[in-house]
Amino acid sequence: MANTTSAKKAVRKIARRTAINKTRRSRVRTYVRKVEEAIASGDKGAAEAALKAAQPELMRAATRGVLHKNTAARKVSRLARRVKTLNA
């Protein structure tokens, strides 16, 4: 347990940030899942639309420090490659 006032405040702050980051991470996963479901169904139009929605969400998470920027870029790249090979 935190003893000093500043440590107690830090604990509160971390709890708030954790909740926010958890929400953002969940949101990213939802968008990525929608792209993967569209790819699995074989619907290229839906997959492209889902990717277009997921890409800014992934990059926003990287900007906010939820994901590393290279991780976000890698995820976008791999999803884009899979969408591109659909009906190729």
From Swiss-Prot:
MF term (GO), any: small ribosomal subunit rRNA binding
Domain of life from the UniProt record: Bacteria
Stated family: Belongs to the bacterial ribosomal protein bS20 family.
InterPro entries: Ribosomal_bS20, Ribosomal_bS20_sf
PANTHER family: 30S RIBOSOMAL PROTEIN S20, SMALL RIBOSOMAL SUBUNIT PROTEIN BS20C
One annotated Gene Ontology cellular component of this protein: small ribosomal subunit
Disulfide-bonded cysteines: none
GO biological process, one term: translation
Functional note: Binds directly to 16S ribosomal RNA.
Signal peptide stretch: none
Name used for this protein in its record: Small ribosomal subunit protein bS20
Keyword terms of this UniProt record: Ribonucleoprotein, Ribosomal protein, RNA-binding, rRNA-binding
UniProt KW Ribosomal protein keyword: yes
Lineage: Bacteria, Pseudomonadati, Pseudomonadota, Alphaproteobacteria, Hyphomicrobiales
